[in-house]
Amino acid sequence: MKTMHFFSACIVASAVTCTTPLPRRDSMIYLLIISFTFLRGCAVFTTARKTLPKGCLLEIAHSLPRHSFFSYINNGSLPSSYFEQAEKTLQDGYVYLILTESKSASSELIGLFTNRQYNHVSLAFDRDLNTLVSYNGGERIASPGLNPEAVTQLTQRAGATMMLYRLPATYSQKRAILDKIREINQEGSAYNLLGLLFKVTLRPNIMFCSQFIYTMLEHAGLNYFEKDAVHVTPTDFIELDYYRTLDFVGKIG
């Protein structure tokens, strides 16, 4: 019965995608994502008796037309006040990594592929997380891509939790990350939904969350494990920390 519900949801999701005006070169990719998600969902259900929550796939399908696989559609989402605030933290000796179980539709979808509890990762320059940033879907407020985040936003759903870690970083390393984020903010960005499923990147500033975080750490010489950024998952930052480079700070939620 659950398999039939999943199948029905996929059909409706495909119809939604087909009837929504889309860039011509993107339309087949949207349908490919729906088809791939359906096949993967059936496989997961068969092996683990797990499927997406009711309405989850429809929510994802409705958001698909907001994405672009070829163009930068997010520009200037981080205001000057963000950079001013981040500048004040460059001397504190750490960058902060935050893993989130947000209970959102996208998080549940990613969980089908990672089989992990925490499916989003963010970066902040300060302990109070006032400079929280990552790649996300924009929550229907901003365009998918590089966006500021807030603890209240990430933990608004029942059962959502966050795990906070800190990574030692020099002034110059934090500066390198901040300057790179500023560059992306000016050039533009988009969320790498295609790469999330097929592990490809079509343009440099089109990334998903863990790809972005790893790219920033690597840019500053702070990556403490070696992996192609497009293959990095949020929990890799914990599971591949063989030398205990991170310090656990606390749990939120």
Can you annotate each of these PLM segments?
Residues 1-253:
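Cysteine-nucleophile amide-bond enzymes
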